Amino acid sequence: MKIRIILRKMSYENSKHRRILKSCLITWFSNPKELHLTNPNMTYPFKFNQWMNLSYKGQNTETWVAFLGDWVVGMISLKQISEEKRGHLFHLYVDKQNRSQGFEQKLIRKIEEKMKEHNLNILTLNVVPENSKALALYKKRGFNIIDSNKKKITMSKNV
């Protein structure tokens, strides 16, 4: 049986969406390793306001959330850098119980669609070196390493 997942655009500026996102993020990031792999700039324990201030305040971003029925199972965000015709993928996360079922791929495809709609040609992302599963996923999706150091690997792909 094929699992049906619905992607919905959500905004941190919408109070209802913010409540939903906050609840999910607090649950997902109760584990410091999960938080570090998703956003190494965050400190543990997870603080929602810090999350918003670091990544979503005054940014030209959109966030897509994966729903399995009424349950939020994942999310992804895109920052548009129009003057460079570039988008930056960040905060791709799927909860542990729903990983490796194609949800990550579907979320990335959604971002690639949005890139085309916004006339953005280059998609970049950062990943921590110890996140081998994410690295493998991004390579499978056609991303190439363009820079790396001990703290992060930067990848890019033409869309």
Regions picked out by a protein language model, each given a short descriptive name:
Residues I108, M115-N126:
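Conserved GNAT acetyl-CoA-binding A-motif
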Residues L92-R99, V128:
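A short, internal acetyl-CoA/4′-phosphopantetheine-binding micro-motif in the GNAT/acyltransferase core
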Residues Q105:
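Residues forming the Rossmann-fold NAD(P)(H) cofactor-binding site
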Residues G102:
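Conserved G/P- and acidic residue-centered "switch" motifs that form tight phosphate/ATP-binding loops
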Residues Y138, F143:
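Conserved active-site tyrosine of GNAT-family acetyltransferases
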Residues K2-F90, D95, I108-K110, K114, ...:
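Acetyl-CoA-dependent GNAT
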Residues L125-L135, K151-S156:
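Conserved beta-strand-loop-alpha-helix junction that forms the acyl-donor binding cleft
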